[in-house]
């Protein structure tokens, strides 16, 4: 029998932010009714645990070491109906030995059916293009995965030693060329994810959240952060950049106490990797493909608290401003003596933005602008410091990236699935002037979730409270869209 905290169930039922769904024999699956300001449910258990983690970092210990031998479970990841084009490349096949597993002993629910592969477009074979897949996945780090927060999941299925096998199997199964991960603990990156994925032909970069700088070496091991992995046969790392929002807030706080008191204390980060596409990744190859083509990949984990929607939006604006600086510098290095051309560097932005599709964060990223009077700013008096930060004196804040979201609500109704919150907070954005989505991974079967009364994740078959996103993109060579510029450096 699974233990469900009655107090939490009552809180969810009585919360104006939720309503229960009593279908399927009164399973009581919480269904989100959004507030006018479209913020996340304040009872989102994962976010409550993050807050406790900030307050109780000192008390970390490895969980479940005292338990008897856990049941081994051979994770069976779903196989897409249609495979992405890039999967037909043998370099995408994992060469690493799978982690050992045994038949399940306590699993009473069949695994979910395959997540469908949804074709969107055919590649344009008349121009050089690099076809690649990208995954975005919040893996739910060990520190946050407690019985107090996820009482509907068996203890053994919450244990990291069990979940990490399913997570790495899922990552390997989809074999994305670029992998964007959030909530990766420092020790787990260096001692698990990096060595495992290096065996599969990946290189990776990582940074923990900013608080790690103030901690001892022992405590630092358990701070989570963001990671980017890329297939070494397709990409080369040119430069990596860490974006620390608390440092940016402190440097731009003049004239706004709220920038110091609300934004600066939050230690979320963004991590960017400037990659060069290798020549053999282009099809068809031509003289144009001998010209170096940079791609900027960024992963971010934005602040969680729904009461701080202003912080979420400001962190996202800071992120876009820093990415613009990186792109401008990269464009200048590839085109010396010429005016910066941001189109020379394509942008891929992935992450857990903890923001719903109709939030200020997603409006800013997707539309390229947001009003200074947007409700998410909460009239906190950020106008002057944001104008100074973004060099903007108009009535709206803008960016010039021309981004599009790979997923929408019709395709993926939820990327985060817990007992008291189900919604979209994870995104993959791409430069729509330089990339075309060819296909994407569809959602987990809603029928399977309903018929098996899966009220939330993690679950013995689903290792995180987030579902991974996977998109196949066709990257067009910028030199094929226009005459090659004079002076473009060939950095082969």
List each model region and its residues.
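Residue-level marker for buried hydrophobic side chains located in beta-strands
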Residues: 134-135, 349
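Active-site metal-binding loops of divalent metal-dependent hydrolases
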Residues: 139, 184, 302, 352-353, ...
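Metal-dependent phosphoester-hydrolase catalytic domains
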Residues: 2-46, 55-121, 265, 277-285, ...
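Structured beta-strand-rich core segments of catalytic domains in phosphoester-bond hydrolases
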Residues: 105-131, 172, 178-304, 308, ...
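Acidic, Ser/Thr-rich intrinsically disordered and amphipathic helical segments
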Residues: 162, 166-167, 183, 188, ...
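Divalent metal-dependent phosphoesterase catalytic cores across multiple superfamilies
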Residues: 109, 154-177, 188-194, 199-200, ...
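Acidic/histidine-rich helix-loop elements
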Residues: 140-161, 246, 250-258, 262-263
């Amino acid at each position: 029998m699974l233990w469900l905290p009655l107090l939490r169930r009552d809180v969810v039922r009585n919360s104006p932010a939720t309503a229960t769904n009593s279908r399927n024999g009164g399973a009581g699956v919480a269904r989100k009714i959004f507030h006018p300001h479209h913020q996340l449910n304040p009872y989102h258990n994962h976010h409550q645990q993050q807050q406790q983690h900030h307050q109780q970092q000192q008390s970390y210990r490895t969980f479940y070491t005292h338990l008897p031998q856990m049941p081994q479970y051979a994770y069976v990841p779903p196989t897409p109906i249609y495979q992405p084009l890039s999967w037909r490349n043998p370099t995408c096949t994992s060469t690493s030995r799978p982690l050992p597993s045994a038949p399940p002993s306590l699993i009473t629910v069949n695994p979910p059916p395959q997540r469908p592969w949804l074709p969107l477009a055919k590649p344009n074979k008349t121009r050089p293009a690099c076809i690649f897949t990208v995954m975005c996945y919040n893996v739910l780090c060990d520190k946050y995965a407690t019985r107090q927060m996820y009482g509907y999941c068996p203890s053994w299925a919450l244990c990291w030693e069990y979940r990490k096998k399913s997570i790495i199997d899922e990552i390997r199964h989809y074999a994305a060329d670029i992998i964007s991960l959030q909530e990766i603990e420092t020790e787990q990156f260096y001692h698990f994810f990096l060595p495992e994925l290096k065996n599969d032909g990946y290189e990776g970069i990582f940074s923990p959240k900013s608080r790690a700088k103030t901690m001892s070496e022992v405590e630092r091991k358990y701070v989570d952060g963001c990671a980017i992995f890329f297939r070494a046969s397709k990409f080369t790392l040119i430069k990596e950049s860490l974006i620390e929002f608390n440092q940016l807030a402190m440097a731009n706080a003049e004239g706004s106490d709220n920038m110091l008191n609300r934004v600066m204390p939050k230690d979320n980060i963004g991590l960017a990797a400037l990659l060069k596409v290798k020549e053999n990744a282009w099809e068809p190859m031509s003289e144009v493909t001998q010209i170096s083509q940079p791609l900027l990949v960024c992963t971010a984990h934005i602040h969680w608290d729904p009461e701080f929607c202003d912080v979420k939006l400001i962190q996202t604006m800071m992120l876009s401003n820093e990415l613009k600086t990186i792109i401008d510098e990269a464009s200048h290095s590839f085109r010396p003596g010429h005016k910066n051309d941001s189109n020379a560097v394509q942008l891929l932005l992935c992450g857990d933005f903890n923001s719903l599709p109709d939030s200020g964060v997603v409006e800013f990223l997707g539309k390229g602008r947001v009003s200074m009077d947007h409700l998410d700013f909460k009239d906190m008096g950020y106008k002057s410091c944001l104008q100074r930060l973004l060099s903007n004196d108009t009535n709206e804040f803008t960016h010039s990236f021309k981004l599009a979201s790979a997923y929408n609500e019709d395709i993926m109704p939820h990327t985060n699935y817990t007992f008291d919150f189900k919604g979209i907070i994870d995104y993959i954005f791409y430069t729509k002037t330089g990339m075309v989505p060819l296909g994407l991974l569809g959602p987990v079967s809603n029928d399977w979730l309903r018929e098996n009364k899966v009220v939330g994740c993690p679950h013995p078959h689903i290792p995180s409270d987030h579902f991974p996103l996977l998109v196949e993109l066709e990257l067009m060579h910028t030199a094929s869209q226009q005459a090659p510029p004079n002076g473009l450096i060939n950095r082969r």
